[in-house]
UniProtKB/Swiss-Prot annotation:
Its EC number is 4.2.3.74. Induction: The botrydial biosynthesis cluster genes are co-regulated by the Ca(2+)/calcineurin signal transduction pathway, which is under the control of the alpha subunit BCG1 of a heterotrimeric G protein. Expression of the cluster is also positively regulated by the cluster-specific transcription factor BOT6. Residues 1-60 are annotated as: Disordered. A motif (DDXXD motif) lies at residues 141-145. This is Presilphiperfolan-8-beta-ol synthase. The gene is BOT2. The keyword Metal-binding applies. Gene3D superfamilies: Farnesyl Diphosphate Synthase (1.10.600.10). It comes from Botryotinia fuckeliana. Residues 15-27 have a biased composition (Low complexity). GO terms for molecular function: magnesium ion binding; sesquiterpene synthase activity. The lineage of its organism: Eukaryota, Fungi, Dikarya, Ascomycota, Pezizomycotina.
């Protein structure tokens, strides 16, 4: 699953609030402004011997340049970041009844940083709703990823049914006490519905159903032990749905006040931009999470799939993913080349929508490095050197 469980991430996250710059300047957000972190410990003799014994998993891999092409610009952070973060973090802590320690860890995860890059021009109230949705999707997703719904198809389907009912107006009014996760989603839906057109509301519903449908497929595959019985394209098809990018794009449309007519939204070029965004998030996550997945014994990862299915080394698998990232860039520009003009007013919104697709992928990339989501305090060095050290085999959890 692409979206990590909240609790494990809370322990590993690091704050990024000291490195913010708003869109009041032209510099945006600069990762190079951070103080270089202490260098990672170099592989010792035992680790080098491990490479000789297990050449498929060396002590380190060289990651591809994930900051190239459409990811090379410096993202802009919404100037309402600090106010929205304070409001949203307090609210979710109260709703979920977090104790002080969990609330502090949640604050360090800094989902507002992520939302602020997705919609740098969003007003404060809309940015707060985007943060609330991000909190919801992590909590909701965790139930299917590592929680009680992971291997319970009937219960998973019921949870999805009840969540869809919220958007259909057929659900009871939830409270923080009766069902906090559904309550958060219901509050987000209420706020979007109050200011959005029927077309935008339907788009929100459709993209969430798309996400939910693939979560249920994931649960079925988990129960059936099908993690490595599909090819790369089948894996990517599933992950495009479960990654959460499609509803995140709809969320960012709301935040930015974008209004693309449905017949334009349905054009293959815009659909391909959404698909590229989802693929970039998936590929970045699977490379950067590989070390943590090894430590936790998790194998739902493209790296592991490539290594097992095609008998590749870790480095060869990374290189394949690097080629897939470059192919995403090519697909992006080909899609834009086929995009027709609809006139000034519509084209303005189309270009804003295209930028949202790009910003969702780029925001995930910068957030993943900056907050210690996967790499802990080594994110800056991995970005600078391209070297990601892997844990010794003796430290691994047997899945």
């Amino acid at each position: 699953m692409a979206i990590p469980a909240l609790e494990p991430q809370l322990h590993d996250a690091d704050t990024s609030s000291n490195n913010m710059s708003s869109n009041s300047t032209d510099s945006g957000y600069d990762t190079n402004s951070t103080t270089p972190l202490e260098k990672s410990e170099k592989p010792n003799t035992q680790e080098l011997k491990q490479q000789q014994l297990d050449p498929k998993r060396p002590p380190f891999v060289r990651v591809p340049d994930l900051f190239g092409s459409i990811m090379s610009t410096k993202p802009v952070v919404n100037p309402n970041y600090f106010a929205a973060k304070a409001r949203g973090d307090r609210w979710i802590a109260r709703v979920m009844n977090f104790n002080k320690a969990v609330a502090a860890r949640n604050s360090k995860v800094d989902l507002c940083f992520l939302a602020s890059m997705w919609a740098p021009d969003a007003p404060e109230d809309r940015l707060v709703m985007m943060l609330d949705w991000n909190h919801w999707v992590f909590l909701f997703d965790d139930q299917f990823d590592e929680g009680h719904l992971k291997e319970d198809p009937a219960a998973a389907a019921e949870e999805v049914k009840q969540t869809i009912a919220i958007m259909g107006g057929n659900a009871p009014r939830y409270t923080a006490e009766s069902n906090p996760i559904r309550y958060v989603f219901q509050q987000c839906w209420d706020r979007l519905k109050a200011v959005s057109s029927q077309e935008m509301q339907q788009r929100w519903i459709d993209q969430h159903k798309r996400y939910f449908d693939q979560l249920l497929v994931q649960v079925d595959q988990q129960v059936g032990g099908e993690n490595f019985t599909r090819d790369v394209e089948a894996y990517m098809d599933l992950r495009r749905g479960t990654i959460g990018v499609y509803p995140a794009i709809s969320l960012s449309e709301y935040g930015a006040g974008v209004n693309v007519p449905q017949h334009v939204y349905d054009h293959p070029s815009l659909q391909e931009c959404m698909k590229v965004s989802a693929d970039l998030v998936t590929l970045v996550n699977d490379v950067l999470s590989y070390r943590k997945d090894l430590e936790l014994g998790v194998d739902h990862n493209l790296m592991s799939l490539l290594m097992q299915r095609d008998n590749l080394s870790a480095q060869q698998a990374v290189d394949v993913i690097g080629d897939m990232v470059n192919e995403c860039y090519r697909r992006w520009y080909l899609a834009l080349a086929e995009l027709p003009s609809y006139g000034e007013k519509i084209d303005y919104n189309v270009m804003k929508f295209v930028e949202i697709c790009r910003a969702v992928a780029q925001g995930n990339l910068y957030w993943s490095f900056q907050t210690g989501r996967y790499l802990g305090p080594e994110g800056h060095e991995v970005h600078e050197t391209g070297i990601m050290y892997l844990p010794p085999a003796a430290n691994l959890v047997v899945a």
